[in-house]
Amino acid sequence: MEDTFRHKGLRKKMVEDLLARVEIEGLDRQTVAEKKRQVCRAIEEVPRHCFIDTAFDSFAYQDRAFPIGDGQTISQPSTVLAQTVLLDVNPGDKILEVGTGSGYQAMVLERLVAKVYTIERHKEVNLRTKQLYTAHGG
């Protein structure tokens, strides 16, 4: 699926909203602020609409979860932001993600670290995600 100027604009707006709205506790304020900016830059690079069914394309950049098959969902962007900030990842880190799902979280993580290893137990979700992941630089 193409990443159009419309999608990029919606993604930029979503990131601005996430930066302003999402509060994260568990790390000191300065670290949280810095990590939020880093993670939001990574989120802005990943075309979320490519990781969901085209039926949801118009809603891809809302802070909502969407079904991806086999009873699984793609997490809402605020959840991806909070989880990733709290992981406190750094360049050169290696990440093991259990439960690949759509592959969106792994793509965000890959923008921040050297290597992401991810496994998925649902065969259909896994096959679809492998194709998406490869198509988008994973």
What are these regions (language model features)?
Residues 1-55:
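N-terminal auxiliary segments of SAM/dcSAM-dependent transferases
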Residues 13, 82, 128:
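Alpha-helical scaffold segments in soluble metabolic enzymes
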